[in-house]
Amino acid sequence: MNIRKVDTFSGHRDSVYTIISDKTGHGFYSAGADGFVIQWDLQKPDLGKLVARAGTSVYALALHESSQSMWIGQNFEGIQLLNTQDNKIEKTSKITNSTIFDIRFAADKALIALGDGVVVVMDIPSFAVQRHIKIAGKSIRSIAVNIETNEFATGDSDCNIHIFDLDGFKLKKTIQAHTNSVFSVKYSPDGKYLFTTGRDAHLKIWDVNDAYGIVVDIPAHMYAINDVTFSPDRSLFATCSMDKSIKVWDMSTFKLKKIIDRARHAGHGTSVNKLLWTGFENQLISCSDDRMISVWEVA
């Protein structure tokens, strides 16, 4: 496996916390502590377009494809709805005074993870809050939706994973998963596994069809693992960490294949916060507290 650094995108004035696809096939959005939401084109490196100013730090973005709207999580302020056609804010809803860590869509619902231990369920067409689900005493850091099983999972700073039914939002299972905060929960593309990471620097993989039994527990990094993502062809996955590194793993064996760091590949200088693996030339994108977004070719 060969790793090549393709580009570095600079433009943010502070830590970059999140990156999501813009669904063009060759672009993405980023946001972070400066409150800027920027659109980038992988075909035109480092020419970012400022599409929104949130006014507060942003941990979470989500693009709703059918309505062409982007949901922006304004920490302590609520949700902004951006029309991606003209880049104008169409609606706002002050759903919380807390931080917003994650936004996920399931059918016509938006699931929003908050810093006060609540998941807010909003109706997408009406942009109305439908319910509050109090899950934890501390922050809900991540949400993952499994369409195959009609479930969603949450990871929280109480060290737990909770599995809910998507229809009635009934709690199905609680797993004391990690020894510290859970930072990321992601279902594998086929829906068979749940990947969880956290402050304890462990990557854990759970078998969805075996009542979420543990498959493997890997001490994968030196410090907290912030995110996990999957390659478009489903053969690999990657993790990123507060230890400044990105690691690439084999999906079939869960074995480490490559480490991307500052010494080997001119990687990030501080915590790597989020990953996005694109279908554009199999490029892997990472963002960091160093204000930079790096693009990697994995071959």
Language model: regions and residue ranges:
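Short loop/turn segments that connect beta-strands within beta-propeller blades
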Residues: 42-45, 83-87, 124-127, 165-169, ...
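Conserved strand-to-loop turn within each blade of WD40 beta-propeller repeats
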Residues: 31-34, 73-76, 113-116, 155-158, ...
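Residue-level detector of Asp-centered blade-edge/turn motifs that repeat once per structural unit
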Residues: 23-24, 65-67, 105-107, 147-148, ...
